[in-house]
Swiss-Prot record:
It comes from Influenza A virus (strain A/Fowl plague virus/Rostock/8/1934 H7N1). HAMAP family: INFV_PA (MF_04063). Transmembrane segments: none annotated. A motif (Nuclear localization signal 2 (NLS2)) lies at residues 184-247. Mn(2+) 1 binds at residues 41, 108, 119-120. Binds 2 manganese ions per subunit. A motif (Nuclear localization signal 1 (NLS1)) lies at residues 124-139. This is Polymerase acidic protein.
Length: 716
């Protein structure tokens, strides 16, 4: 075939085709059918434009003899055959000069007479099938499509064939000749059968080098090459008897399909061990705020100024002492660090003008807490690759932890309403398209249900902390910058409020890669006595730093105020996602919206108003050992939001794995509930995949225990 291509096509076309294939990492010597197809396509594009000119009046002219009149300009701009960068440059300049909409994919030609891009297709299959594939791929009304086949058929958008009869006949004749030439050499059949559907970029993505070798090594038995295997998979129609299909795939496989009955599934095994501990980047239900209402001080909105103002609202400071040490840390350093923060804030107040930011002195306690000079020295790989026993040092398996009750309490708290509003109506973002009345109505109802929710407070707190930390990490790479943890809200009466939760001190932050870590020390106010659930606070050193007067039903009571201090770390990519936590609002809104849609399709009318305003109706919220929990529509909105927020706050590889694997078991159980008689093979393997994600993460363990409640009730 390669020899035929080189004989049959003009050398310039052959050279262009080779360049195109190399650009995609394909070899013309191996993928000879593709080589032939590219040459054919190039030739058709050139023939399409040959001899067609436009005169000064914009009229189309066909000139076949020698040198055309200098006043004529080519009717078609050829884009196909240029390298990608050049091709896009041409497309962009055409769009800029003519105002034509820019296409998503590179077209083949531009027609100056009709002012449109043209996509040329040459197919060995039915023209209409290929036409639909092309149209489906480019999804643009503006690009004109023209398909030719080797049998002389053609098809074009709106049956507008652009060229005169004779020019098209030339193209069809040439295609017919190519087909006959191939047939006479016994090449046509293989060429005809090798045509795949319209390829998207993903399908063009060729595997080369090491990956290619690995792919070839890991082929199932009985397959000689990756192409062979791909062709088999593409042609695999997944219907009919599964066992038969499996045995047809390989002699090695003998899967017995076991029926999945109510008695089949067992509960997930949760790990034993000490209770799991809190691992969020900031305190959740245990956080305490020092607040100012209607802030109007000088420098309002500058975090450091706001923080100092909030600190001044509290008068119960006392000499700090450690009430719950951190098992592994040097606890006096945490105490010294807090005293240093207080001292340096005092220094600032004595200055004439409060600065916008504060960099902490690099004391020994902060250097220790922030891991300064602790990173192992980096050595160039070149210098040590000759060391014979070079290996990565062993890391310990993570210690297994059992589910503790605090994480369910955290979740319940996140679903509750607070007495402040944390988002304005437009926080979810205006839709770009003109919103239909229904969509904005749904959004307003949803926002009303969640604006006062504690999970929404966590979103705004997370967005603020991550934004401030990422900014400081870039702006003050070498400094130990003091970053107040602040949030803003509105009271029931609509008054603005600024809250201070505590402080963060950031370590050195030369973050080159997304995953490079910046260390920080967090110091957060709380009224929670850590001695009640010491296992929850394993990673913290807790100080008692003051006494707070609280108004209660029986009058004022004094409660000790604690400071939860710990060393922590994050990375650019984690901060980027933290800054985007508002997406949780959108995700849960979409989930609620699909419930409204389901209700509306049953009633055959929009049920938005009834859905949100019928306070008597209850909806399933989740599973607990008691059974299916139900609640109002507001509770549903807040629970879905809290789940989304916790997925963000407690994001981890364990959660990724658990979500993906448990979903498979969930689908099987749902199929059983729908009487679809599901069958499974290697159910033990699926349980193994789920349970290897249950190690020590509190949120994953809680989800696993919910999953067990679901299994129990679903199979009753």
């Amino acid at each position: 075939m390669e020899e035929f291509v080189r004989q049959c096509f003009n050398p310039m076309i052959v050279e262009l085709a080779e360049k195109t294939m190399k650009e995609y990492g394909e070899d013309p010597k191996i993928e000879t059918n593709k080589f032939a197809a590219i040459c054919t396509h190039l030739e058709v594009c050139f023939m399409y434009s040959d001899f067609h000119f436009i005169d000064e009046r914009g009229e189309s002219k066909i000139v076949e003899s020698g040198d055309p009149n200098a006043l004529l300009k080519h009717r078609f701009e050829i884009i196909e055959g240029r390298d990608r960068t050049m091709a896009w440059t041409v497309v962009n300049s055409i769009c800029n000069t003519t105002g034509v909409e820019k296409p998503k994919f590179l077209p083949d030609l531009y027609d100056y007479k009709e002012n449109r891009f043209i996509e040329i297709g040459v197919t060995r299959r039915e023209v209409h099938i290929y036409y639909l594939e092309k149209a489906n791929k480019i999804k643009s009304e503006k690009t004109h499509i023209h398909i030719f086949s080797f049998t002389g058929e053609e098809m074009a958008t709106k049956a507008d064939y652009t060229l005169d009869e004779e020019s098209r006949a030339r193209i069809k004749t040439r295609l017919f000749t190519i087909r006959q030439e191939m047939a006479s050499r016994g090449l046509w059949d293989s060429f005809r059968q090798s045509e795949r559907g319209e390829e998207t970029i993903e399908e063009r993505f060729e595997i080369t080098g090491t990956m290619r070798r690995l792919a070839e090594q890991s082929l199932p038995p009985n397959f000689s090459s990756l192409e062979n295997f791909r062709a088999y998979v593409d042609g695999f129609k997944p219907n009919g008897c599964i066992e038969g299909k499996l045995s047809q795939m390989s002699k090695e496989v003998n899967a017995r399909i076991e029926p999945f009955l109510k008695t089949t599934p067992r509960p997930l095994r949760l790990p034993d061990g000490p209770p799991c501990s809190q691992r969020s980047k900031f305190l959740l239900m245990d956080a305490l705020k020092l607040s100012i209402e209607d802030p109007s001080h000088e420098g309002e909105g500058i975090p450091l100024h706001d923080a100092i103002k909030c600190m001044k609202t509290f008068f119960g400071w006392k000499e700090p002492n450690i009430v719950k040490p951190h098992e592994k840390g040097i606890n006096p350093n945490y105490l010294l660090a807090w005293n240093q923060v207080l001292a340096e804030l005092k220094d600032i107040e004595n200055e004439e003008k409060i600065p916008k930011t504060k960099n902490m002195k690099k004391t020994s306690q902060l250097k220790w807490a922030l891991g300064e000079n602790m990173a192992p020295e980096k050595v160039d790989f070149e210098d040590c690759k000759d060391i014979s026993d070079l290996k990565q040092y062993d890391s310990d398996e993570p210690e297994q932890r059992s589910l503790a009750s605090w994480i369910q309490s955290e979740f319940n708290k996140a679903c509750e309403l607070t007495d402040s509003g944390w988002i304005e109506l437009d926080e979810i973002g205006e839709d770009v398209a003109p919103i239909e009345h229904i969509a904005s109505m749904r959004r307003n109802y949803f926002t009303a249900e969640v604006s006062h929710c504690r999970a929404t407070e966590y979103i705004m707190k997370g967005v603020y902390i991550n934004t401030a930390l990422l900014n400081a990490s870039c702006a003050a790479m070498d400094d130990f910058q003091l970053i107040p943890m602040i949030s803003k809200c509105r009271t029931k009466e609509g008054r603005r409020k600024t809250n201070l939760y505590g402080f963060i001190i950031k370590g050195r932050s030369h973050l080159r890669n997304d995953t490079d870590v910046v260390n920080f020390v967090s110091m957060e106010f709380s009224l929670t006595d850590p001695r009640l659930e010491p296992h929850k606070w394993e990673k913290y050193c807790v100080l008692e730093i003051g006494d707070m007067l609280l108004r209660t039903a029986i009058g004022q009571v004094s409660r000790p105020m604690f400071l939860y201090v710990r060393t922590n770390g994050t990375s650019k990519i984690k901060m980027k996602w933290g800054m985007e936590m508002r997406r949780c609002l959108l995700q849960s809104l979409q989930q609620v919206e699909s419930m409204v849609e389901a209700e509306s399709s049953v009633k055959e009318k929009d049920m938005t108003k009834e859905f949100f305003e019928n306070k008597s109706k209850t909806w399933p919220i989740g599973e607990s050992p008691k059974g299916v929990e139900e609640g109002s529509i507001g509770k549903v909105c807040r629970t879905l939001l809290a789940k989304s927020v916790f997925n963000s706050l407690y994001a981890s590889p364990q959660l990724e794995g658990f979500s993906a694997e448990s979903r498979k078991l969930l689908l099987i159980v749902q199929a059983l509930r729908d009487n679809l008689e599901p069958g499974t093979f290697d159910l033990g393997g699926l349980y193994g995949a789920i349970e290897e994600c249950l190690i020590n993460d509190p949120w994953v363990l809680l989800n696993a225990s919910w999953f067990n409640s679901f299994l129990t009730h679903a199979l009753k």
